[in-house]
Amino acid sequence: MKLSWLKTTKNRLVDLINDNLSDKNTMHKYLGVYEPLMSRKKETARNVLEVGIWTGGSIRLWYDYFKNATIHGLDWFPENINIQADIKNKQRIKLYTGIDAYNEDFFKRTFLDKGIKCDIVLDDGPHFLETMKAFIRLYSQILTDDGILIIEDIEELEWLDILKNEVPDNLKQYVKTFDLRSISIHQNSILFIIDKSKTN
């Protein structure tokens, strides 16, 4: 995928992101992939979910970008001073802290049993292979018909085939991968994506 369009096209995610609070545009260069994917859902997305809150920089980005969506932020660290105060009391932001987002009981109780469907789900959690596999098994179940699942910061190229084996058969045709290591600082700048969007 060519990313040269960034040089000439205004990128709303780039405009909105605070590079001091998120490394998606600095260390990793993910926004060049995300903009064409997410711009299709900018107005229509109703639920966006990310595992891995840290300071809340990306949660704030999704809140500002998807104006009509509820943003779900999950983290196994308890809520603490690292999370920016201005995202804690927003009506469209729901934070789940001190929990295991990869636990099947938590997932079922919090999302599946409530019938919540997500337009976009992202895993920016501990970056372990086992948690990534669990993320696919669990959160692919709550994607909308044209939903997108993204796993960030994949440590090894060999993991991509392992992760694809976790994808339900009916979703395997939608798998995309991006190796951005040549333009990024971090050597784990690899993305695994299930893109059910109708426009590709």
Residue ranges of model-derived segments:
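A short alpha-helical cap/connector motif
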Residues: 1-151, 155-200
